[in-house]
Amino acid sequence: MDNKEAIIQATIRLIEENGEHLEEVTVREICKRAGVGLGLVNYHFGNKDKLIEQCIERMINGTVEH
């Protein structure tokens, strides 16, 4: 799994764990779970909101890997 996919999968897990409290999901926590550096979120997605948006779209479309 590449870094971008690791970030997406970690974010999806955190979204599932935190439910409606997305504001509690931090970039630092995402990166820790994904095993990547903080700068990679901005590199691949621009910001946390865009990352979360992409993850939610993926969850809705049913393309989540478990």
Which sequence ranges carry the predicted segments?
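Alpha-helical DNA-recognition elements
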Residues: R13, N47, R58
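Amphipathic alpha-helical linker/stalk segments
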Residues: C55-H66
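The alpha-helix within a helix-turn-helix
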Residues: C31
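Short, amphipathic alpha-helix enriched in basic
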Residues: D2-R28, G39
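HTH DNA-binding helix-turn interface
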Residues: E17-H21, G35, N42-Q54
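Generic N-terminal leader/processing signal
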Residues: M1-D2, G46
